[in-house]
Regions:
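Short, surface-exposed ligand- or partner-binding patches at beta-edge/loop junctions that are enriched
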Residues: 86
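Rhodanese-like catalytic fold shared by cysteine-dependent sulfurtransferases
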Residues: 1-26, 33-82, 93-141
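Conserved G/P- and acidic residue-centered "switch" motifs that form tight phosphate/ATP-binding loops
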Residues: 90
Length: 141
């Protein structure tokens, strides 16, 4: 294991490999609905899977979603499933992975680069790392 309170951080290549080769792996996008609508979302259709969407925090106040555990439970996923959490940059997804691990989910990973990745030298996201920059499938609108 590791010294983390969840299964660990994974990069785009490892996440895609898990989603592709582990039939009981799931991607949970825990960004806000505004981000899903305006920035785009991971597209797993060529794997025969769907991304699950459950907000960790709600826009615009960014308050923690008190129904997060309930909404995850309603997805019907086993606590033994491999769950990969993704947010914009890896912070909220880490919190979500830790939270669910503490609630009995055994294989919660943080997509540590996030959907948009780190800031570049100009303070913009999307050009350094992350889901989009790694050329993994995504869609907008």
């Amino acid at each position: 294991m590791n010294d983390l309170d969840y299964a660990g951080d994974i990069n785009p290549e490892k996440a895609w490999d898990l989603l592709k080769n582990n039939k009981d792996s799931h991607l949970i996008d825990c960004r806000t609905s505004a981000e899903w609508n305006f920035v785009g979302v991971p597209d797993l259709t060529n794997l025969g899977k769907n991304t699950h969407f459950v907000e960790w925090q709600s826009y615009p106040l960014m308050e923690k979603n008190d129904n997060f555990l309930k909404e995850i439970s309603e997805l019907g996923l086993s606590k033994d499933s491999t769950l990969i959490f993704i947010c914009r940059s890896g912070a909220r997804s880490r919190s979500a992975a830790e939270f669910l691990t503490n609630h009995g989910y055994k294989h919660c990973f943080n997509f540590c680069e996030g959907f948009e990745g780190s800031h570049d030298e100009l303070g913009h996201r999307g050009s350094v790392n992350g889901w989009k920059n790694s050329k993994l499938p995504w869609k907008q609108g």
